[in-house]
Amino acid sequence: MLGVALLSGAVHAAVQPLDRVVAIVDNDVVMQSQLDQRVHEVQQTIAKRGGGVPPTSALEQQVLERLIVENLQLQIGERSGIRITDEELNQAIGTIAQRNGMSLDQFRAALARDGLSFDDAREQVKREMIISRVRQRRVAERIQVSEQEVKNFLASDLGKMQMSEEYRLANILIPTPEAANSDDIQKAARKVGDVYQQLRQGADFGQMAIANSASENALEGGEMGWRKAGQLPPDFAKMLSSMPVGEITQPIRIPNGFIILKLEEKRGGSENVLRDEVHVRHILIKPSEIRSEAATEQLAERLYDRIKNGEDFGELAKSFSEDPGSALNGGDLNWVDPNSLVPEFREQMANAQQGVVTKPFKTQYGWHVLEVLGRRATDSTEQAREQQALSVLRNRKYDEELQTWLRQIRDEAYVEIKLPGADQAAQ
């Protein structure tokens, strides 16, 4: 998402007029220049999607709220000692360029065409990386999914449904305060009802999300991307399973407010998953304080020659191999998934003919000779389903926990909004 934003003409680097504070956020501030820049980004992104661009006044409060929550997370990162090294940052920039089909020089040129300096882009990426790590520490690492939860999910009607249904969704969230009273709930209900009526009368969903939603994805038009049925609350999944594409739900009461969903696309179907496995054995010789790298290579060469001259591979492995997990079994690693092995070993194994011993080669562990004894494709559909279920349950818990945590840090923070015309109740 960040790479797309950087290359969508979404960043405005024009010289700003005299700056001023628009929000005090605990020990930091949000400046008018930051708000103006982000509003411009959002407007440019909407324009490139072909939508009508809302006026600046309609976006400012929504964008300011996002900047406040981002600022709080960056402050947590600072207090937690989270640092992004130049090497990590360069790697992230390279990945963004690669995903956009560009070299680093082409990426720099694209940024320049969009009015953004490379240094500004690096800072934007750095902020996103810090926020990601804060969320990993504060939210993701606390989430646990047991084997029993996975089994229960796969046995449930919802679990079975999730294997065949996937939805591309958008949402509009009208929130209520954490300790909402009846007046708060009625106010939110009136607002979501008004939004729903405008949608039924033909208002653009994305525009309404940008103008009204409190969800994290509001400025993307409420786009949630593809979600498995199992990632959604059961009632949502059942509702969507029979809902036509393009339709919206009525307002739904959820713990932190009201939500309206739009079903953008639907897809489904699951296939058997086949995994390649290789039956392989090897001899590992490691360098040590008493055996140099050159001597280790020479020993591996001598063992290779002895095998080629007819000596038994398994017996030599028992006598010489320094892999404690396989030496006593004649070097036999049994059936292995190539993806579980280091790249050099995997490449040698892929190129080896069955029954033919490879010449010695080096990995991080030492010098090897190997022999492929067989190849097969195994049905790993069940393991894939279990991994998919684990991912679904973790993602569902993460989404729920993240929204709760973001609301918590916002509620606990000292925030003073100084933007003229802002909703002071939002403080």
Curated annotation (Swiss-Prot):
Gene3D superfamilies: 3.10.50.40, Porin chaperone SurA, peptide-binding domain. Residues 164-265, 275-374 form the PpiC domain. GO terms for molecular function: peptide binding; peptidyl-prolyl cis-trans isomerase activity; unfolded protein binding. It is found in: Periplasm. Its EC number is 5.2.1.8. One of its GO terms (cellular component) is outer membrane-bounded periplasmic space. Pfam families: Rotamase (PF00639), Rotamase_3 (PF13616), SurA_N (PF09312). Disulfide bonds: none annotated. GO terms for biological process: Gram-negative-bacterium-type cell outer membrane assembly; protein folding; protein stabilization. It catalyses: [protein]-peptidylproline (omega=180) = [protein]-peptidylproline (omega=0). Residues 1-13 form the signal peptide. Keywords: Chaperone, Isomerase, Periplasm, Repeat, Rotamase, Signal. Chaperone involved in the correct folding and assembly of outer membrane proteins. Recognizes specific patterns of aromatic residues and the orientation of their side chains, which are found more frequently in integral outer membrane proteins. May act in both early periplasmic and late outer membrane-associated steps of protein maturation. The PPIase activity resides only in the second parvulin domain. The N-terminal region and the C-terminal tail are necessary and sufficient for the chaperone activity of SurA. The PPIase activity is dispensable for SurA to function as a chaperone. The N-terminal region and the C-terminal tail are also required for porin recognition. This is Chaperone SurA. The gene is surA.
